[in-house]
């Protein structure tokens, strides 16, 4: 194999690495966006249903809400 063919092969192989990193970065970002910010909890001991939602994550506000939509709106801030 001549040196020019070897050089072209090396350039092609090296060019695949950024494409692989780009694909993995995309999947990491999409997973990060899909993480829930609220966790369903039981606010009433008499009721066995998960009726409330509380903030979770790296910086939780230790707040619980009657609905998941209220929790999501406040916890994302």
From Swiss-Prot:
Domain of life: Eukaryota
Organism: Arabidopsis thaliana (Mouse-ear cress)
Protein family according to the UniProt entry: Belongs to the MEG family.
Disulfide-linked positions: 38-54, 43-75, 52-71, 55-64
Span of the signal peptide: 1-22
Designated name of the protein: EMBRYO SURROUNDING FACTOR 1-like protein 9
Tissue localization of expression: Expressed in flowers.
Ranges in coiled-coil conformation: none
Keywords for the protein's UniProt record, in alphabetical order: Disulfide bond, Signal
């Amino acid at each position: 194999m001549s040196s020019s063919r070897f050089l072209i092969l090396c350039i092609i192989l090296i060019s695949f690495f950024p494409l692989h990193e780009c694909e993995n970065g995309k999947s990491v970002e999409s997973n990060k966006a899909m993480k829930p910010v609220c966790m369903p909890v039981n606010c009433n001991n008499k009721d066995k249903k998960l009726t409330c939602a509380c903030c979770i994550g790296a910086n939780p506000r230790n707040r619980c809400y009657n609905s998941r939509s209220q929790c999501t709106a406040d916890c994302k801030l």
